[in-house]
């Protein structure tokens, strides 16, 4: 059976999946539009038995709902995004430090660049991420602007790409910003105590 695409319904379903993942796997989860979810599982995957059991468990839970999923872990958001969409296996773990080898043969479209830039790069003869990353940066930046270099740097871990996590509507949280980093244990204890009191009053 074929049904018409419904972008609004798809976006709503993706939002629900993101909130589900927030409660199951990691406190740092966001929509990776248009068809994915990104999570920072560092420090959390051991709660699922490790990286492979966690990935396998996620894939199995989707399969139980008659949904197909591709799940990847990599050093960077960009690399995980690309591998999950290009590699046909259900689960992919890119070993630490192996990002270049994992993505260099993948198509340019997985760099999350605007379609116009991808089309122009194809016209110039570029097909893969590796071909593009091997070229001098300056001429490409002059022609295509900074976005191309930014996406390459994010994929290879040369530029940070923070995840702006989703928050549940009923989430209660408190925070304190500091002008300078603090490291003294007694100072941390003092402010944690204050934050706990603030949190209790919000409950």
Can you name each region flagged by the protein language model?
Residues 1-203:
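Gly/Gly-Pro- and Ser/Thr-rich, intrinsically disordered tail segments characteristic of DNA damage-repair
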